[in-house]
Amino acid sequence: MSRKTQRYSKEFKAEAVRTVPENQLSISEGASRLSLPEGTLGQWVTAARKGLGTPGSRTVAELESEILQLRKALNEARLERDILKKATAYFAQESLKNTR
């Protein structure tokens, strides 16, 4: 007889890990409320406590790095936008001069 492995979404895992301390539950209580095997929930909670987070979560350093990258991209996009605005105004004036 083969045993099917249950797959859980990242969101479900994160919510399950948050539920245990928020409701001051033991692993066994949390597992029974969520209809999970005790060992599974225990592994998720242990990983979260060790700083590994839930699967799919990122570290603070990774998030800060992404923020810096996004800020640089935003500044570049703003600069390009400003250049295009000035170019549009310039060519609009040139067009008006040529039509008079």
Curated annotation (Swiss-Prot):
One of its GO terms (molecular function) is transposase activity. Keywords: Transposable element. GO terms for biological process: DNA transposition. The keyword Nucleotide-binding does not apply. InterPro entries: Homeodomain-like_sf, RD_transcriptional_regulator, Transposase_8, WH-like_DNA-bd_sf. Transmembrane segments: none annotated. It holds the Pfam family HTH_Tnp_1. PANTHER family: PROTEIN DISTAL ANTENNA. Belongs to the transposase 8 family. This is Insertion element IS600 uncharacterized 11 kDa protein.
